Amino acid sequence: MSDRHLSPLLSALTALLLPCLTATAQTGIAIDHDFGDWNPAGDLATADTVGPLVAAGFATDAENLYFHLVYDRLVALDESWEPHGTRLGVDIDGNTSTGQIVGGFQGADIVVHLQDRYVSESNTNGTTEQHSLNDRYVRMAPTYGGEEHEVSLGRAVNGVPVAGTVRWTVRCGSGQQVSGEVALDNTPALAMATPLERAEGAEVRVAFWNMNRRLDEAPALEAMGRILQAVQPDVIGMSEVEDFSAAHVRDLLDGWLPLEGGSWHVAKDDWDLMVCSRWPITTEYPDIYRQFPVLVDAPWAGDLMVAASHLKCCNGAEQRRTEADEYMAFLRDAMTEGGDVDLPSKTPVVYGGDLNMVGPGWAMQTLLTGNIHDEVANGPDFAPDWDGTALRELTCLQSDRAMDYTWRNDNSSWGAGKLDYILVQDGVVKVLREFSLETSSMTAERRTQYGLEPGDDLQASDHYIVVADLKKRDRRPGTKPVQLKKAN
């Protein structure tokens, strides 16, 4: 598991020990809930300890302005269950007599109201216009609650000049504020061009995808087919497929990804989940609410358990935590002798899907660590990896953009966010490649290479497919992974 879940205030403490008068410019930043690309020494600490804001940093590259935000409590930037009232202000013309006032900062031409989910921009005539976060390419991570966050703001769409300096500020509703000034950096944004082919040595490629109930819409089906032909998964966990039969999905997959001498294996639970596999599905466990584990006869020594998930949406943090508790009780039973399910030792388990992880993120902590909330109903805590550690949350950065969001609706007030996840037991599998796919951010050459169209991502669904290549760590000596024939 990433250290970001273990020490969220490390950079804040460093910032408090190393105060400076202005932020140090830096580049090479990904919006991915991994803060290792931020220099804590460049953060500015707030002058008081009232909270919630502890420190903030700022950086630029040729595409974006970036903010690094550190709090003393769990905060979700675009939600108000923990009120924070964070505003980000940027002065792009260097004129303090124009623009908006943000606390003690004058001249903000752009003000991002994170909690209220809009951007206010000043016009030359003294008026302001309101835009959505999506209109102004505001991206942030994590999507759920955390003590540390990062935000990007598109330069071109917001009229940020190509040269000069910008003044910036971060202010919380309770009055904490830090401000600075930096020279604009035109270093290219972090380059991404992840190969869509499976990684060398990969034995299983797993994917998870919310199909948005579009499996009977011709334009969506065409886009889905192109994406799946480009990605070539072995096992797919699907959600929002309640209106379709397993036979319908099997026929689609047989057309998109034909198997030599056979058909796809498709298992459906009692609600909206399916697991589809090139190899036989030997056992199904459909009784776990909004989660569907199955056993797959994988090409390595022993089985593979894949659990497709679609946790409660929106304001359902308590229910998501209950659902996570129920699944982890199942996994604990499966990994220990006795009870209803007994997996052979070191059987890899992969969990993923649309987790709807917004709000405090309690469910994610349960899923990663095995820290069960309601132990009376679901039993004791346990270590969910066979090596006695926590699970690993895969970043699944987009193949062609250094962003981790997997859901996007440009007409929504909610900003793009990461809702789709893959969690693995990295004590028993190696992750050789991982990505999500936003076709609109690919170059024309890359799309041509893989037979994709610019709008395939949102034509297929409002969620992006997430993909991981896995290799079992303890495959028997002398055995070789099955080589799959690529479909035309």
Model-derived segments and their meaning:
Residues 11-20:
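Bacterial N-terminal signal peptides
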Residues 27-118:
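Surface-exposed, glycine/proline- and aromatic-rich loop segments on solvent-exposed faces
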